[in-house]
Structures are given as C-alpha cells and as structure tokens.
Amino acid sequence: MDFVDLKSAEEFSPQHHVHKSLLTTSHSDISIACWEPGQTSPIHRHPGADEIYHVISGSGLFNDGRTERRLVAGDTVIFPAGEVHQVTALTRMVLYRVQAGADRHPESLDAWPASR
C-alpha cells in the first residue's frame, strides 16, 4: 500500500500552477495541482485518458468548450478521454486529480475546436 499526505504535497508558484504526480501505475496517475488566482491551463485534451478533478480548496472555472462551471471545495468533475477542457483558478485552489488510461499525455490546442 502506498500513502500520500496531500497537505505536505502542496506547493504554489506565482508564475504557473504547480502539478505534482503522487502515485502512478501503468494505467493511472494521482496528482495534486496547486493554482494561484488567475492561473489557467492551456486548452487541451487527453486522447487516451479520463481526467477527474476534485476541488480540495478554493474555487475555479472548469470549461469543456460548451459549458463553463464554477466549482468550489468539495466539487468533482470528470472529463472523459478526448474531451477538450481548460481550468482557471478564481481563488487560490488545490485540486486532486486522477487520470485513468494508458496514454495520459496532454495534447494542447491553440483554440477551441469549431465542432464544439
């Protein structure tokens, strides 16, 4: 059994959000992502992996190109494999992230696809 203390894994940067992988298997990855207000991810997708975010603290906007939702501590969202998405922190925010799938690498896009 592996164990991680999430609170001790928190780390923030004024330049960009900090993402730390905590536990990894061949088909999954558990990580923590720490965001300062206003920090945003590129528009991207993970073609081979589902991505689940659980908001530990703070709040942010989660966008799939069709819907933008404000999530707060205690909320959870899932982006199925291949779904384009973007995350923006409204306040200092800590996310618990689980990726499930063999190919978890992100594919960045310059803009939202026309066929949203």
Residue ranges and their predicted role:
Residues 66-81:
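Short acidic-glycine-tyrosine-enriched beta hairpin
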Residues 31-46:
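Conserved short histidine dyad/triad with adjacent acidic residue
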Residues 56-57, 72-73, 91:
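A cytosolic small-molecule/anion-sensing beta-strand core signal
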Residues 40-42, 77, 81-86:
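Histidine-centered metal-chelating micro-motifs
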Residues 81-105:
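Ligand-binding loop in jelly-roll beta-barrel domains
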Residues 1-28, 42, 73, 108-116:
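A short, N-terminal "cap"/entry segment at the start of jelly-roll beta-barrel domains
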